[in-house]
Amino acid sequence: MFENRNAELSLKQYQKLVDYWVQSYGVRYFSELTNLGVLMEEVGEVARLLTRMHGDQSFKDRNEEKELGDELADVLFVVTCLANQHGVDLARALQENLDKKTSRDAERHIKNPKLRRESGK
């Protein structure tokens, strides 16, 4: 199941892969409440990294400077676990969510003067 690591994964494939991994290596899913706590921890790690990268604080040491992609992948893994636990098809949910945003915000952001780029910036 892990052989072709260079192939692009669809969301559906990723959900199946995560389920396989949990059943094979994790024994079972953590409870939803535990996964919620783990998700908050992982989002906190992303926030801490981005704060150090773009905010006023520097990294305390070089070992602390983790790759953003790895931290975001941790978030996606836990979100996928929660989706699997609740029978949510992430591909369908994301498409429906994007359709909703497109319908709702079709002109809202374009007309927002705060988002317009000023010349010279």
Question: Residues of each region from the PLM?
Answer:
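Flexible "arm" and connector segments at domain edges
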Residues: 1-72, 76-121
